[in-house]
Amino acid sequence: MSRPVPNPGILDIAPYTPGKSPAPEAGRKVFKLSANETPFGPSPKAMDAYRDAVAHLEDYPEGTSRVLRAAIGRAYGLDPDRIICGAGSDEILNLLAHTFLSHGDEAISTTHAFLVYPIATMANGATNIVAPETGYTADIDAILERVTPKTKMVWLANPNNPTGTYLPFDEIRRLRAGLPPHVLLVLDGAYSDYVSRNDYEFGIELVATTENTVLTHTFSKIHGLAALRIGWMFGPAHIVDAMNRIRGPFNVSTPAMLAAAAAIEDTAHVQMTRMHTEKWRSWLTDELTNLGLKVTPSVTNFILIHFPDARGRTASEADAFLTRRGLVLRALDNYCLPNALRMTIGTEEANRLVADGLRDFMART
C-alpha cells in the first residue's frame, strides 16, 4: 500500500534522547540532575511577569518579540534589530540550518557536540562532518582540516555540552579567520553565563564585526525558564532578515517573552546562581577525584564524570546505583561517552548525596 515517504535522510537521524525525568515516588525524594537545570528556579521577577501575562492568554503574542529584544539589547549593549528570538535556542539552531543548509552541503560539528547540531544538519539534507576533539575540547585545526568546498556551516558550543570544556577566544578568532567567508560560524553560548575565565569571551565583538558569524543563547539554564522554551540569537542584519522570512509569526509566547525580559534584568538572581555553581562545582570535582574518578575540568553548571572500564565500576552500573537512591544523572552513550555520566550541579543536599552515593558505589566489593 502506498503511503507518504519522508525526505531522503530523515530516517537516518537518531531521535534526540533527553535526560531522564523520573516521576516522584511515594516516600522517596528524587533529584533530577540530568538536564542541566538550575536548582533555584526562575527569578521572582520573572515569575511575577509570567503571572501577569497569564491573564491575557486569549491574545496573540507580539510577533517580533520587541519587548524581549529590547531587554536583551540593554543587557548586552546590542542593536535589537540584529536579534531574533525563538522557542528555545533549539528553534534558532533549526532555523539557521533551514535557512543556510541544503542537499549537497556539509556542516561541521565535533565528536562530543550537542546532538541538535547533526539533527538540524541532516534534517535539511546536508551532511554532518565530525571533527575529532582533543582532551574533550574542540580542536580548531581538526575543524579547519575538514573544510571543503561543500562546507556551509560550523557548529561550535563554547562552553561545550556535555563536556563542560571551553576554548579561549583567541582560538575562536583563529577559527573564524581560517574559515572561508561563505562558511557560517554558529557560536552556541548556552552556558556562557557560568564562565569566569579571563581568556573567555561571549562572542559579541566577533559577531558585530563580521558578516558570517552568529551567537545563540538560551533562557533555559541560568535563568531557569526551560519549561517556557525561549532563546535568542545575535547576528548580522542580513542573516536575521533571512531567518525572519521563515520564522513562525507568533513563535514566542507572551508569558515566555515577558518572563525572559524580567529574568535578564534580575542580575542579583543570576549572580547568586553563578556563585553557588562555582562553589559546588569545585567541591564535587575534588570529592569525586578523591574517590578515584576522573572529572573533566568544567566551566559550566555540570560536570563530566568518567568511570573505570571494569566490571562493577562502569558508568551504566553507577547510573543504576544512583537512580535507585533517587539521584538521576545523564547517561552519555549517544554522545560517544559510554563510560561517563554528566551531573548537573544541584542543591547542596543533592550534591552531597551524589558524592556519598558514589563513595558507596566505588567501595563495593
Swiss-Prot record:
Catalytically driven reaction(s): L-histidinol phosphate + 2-oxoglutarate = 3-(imidazol-4-yl)-2-oxopropyl phosphate + L-glutamate
What enzyme class is recorded for this protein? transferase
Tagged with keyword Magnesium:
no
Modified-residue entries (N6-(pyridoxal phosphate)lysine), positions: K221
Q: Matching Pfam families, A to Z?
A: Aminotran_1_2
Keyword annotations from UniProtKB, A to Z: Amino-acid biosynthesis, Aminotransferase, Histidine biosynthesis, Pyridoxal phosphate, Transferase
BP-aspect Gene Ontology terms: L-histidine biosynthetic process
Q: Which Gene3D superfamilies match?
A: Aspartate Aminotransferase, domain 1, Type I PLP-dependent aspartate aminotransferase-like (Major domain)
- Residue span of region Disordered: 1-22
Q: Does the keyword Amino-acid biosynthesis apply?
A: yes
According to its UniProt record, the EC number is 2.6.1.9
Question: What terms describe the molecular function in GO for this protein?
Answer: histidinol-phosphate transaminase activity; pyridoxal phosphate binding
What does the record give as cofactor?
Answer: pyridoxal 5'-phosphate
Q: Which InterPro entries match?
A: Aminotransferase_I/II_large, HisP_aminotrans, HistidinolP_aminotransfase, PyrdxlP-dep_Trfase, PyrdxlP-dep_Trfase_major, PyrdxlP-dep_Trfase_small
Pathway info: Amino-acid biosynthesis; L-histidine biosynthesis; L-histidine from 5-phospho-alpha-D-ribose 1-diphosphate: step 7/9
- NCBIfam families reported for this sequence: hisC (TIGR01141)
Hey, which family's this protein in? Belongs to the class-II pyridoxal-phosphate-dependent aminotransferase family. Histidinol-phosphate aminotransferase subfamily.
* Self-association state and partner proteins as the record states: Homodimer.
Protein's name according to its UniProt entry: Histidinol-phosphate aminotransferase
Taxonomic source organism = Nitrobacter winogradskyi (strain ATCC 25391 / DSM 10237 / CIP 104748 / NCIMB 11846 / Nb-255)
Tell me what gene encodes this.
Answer: hisC
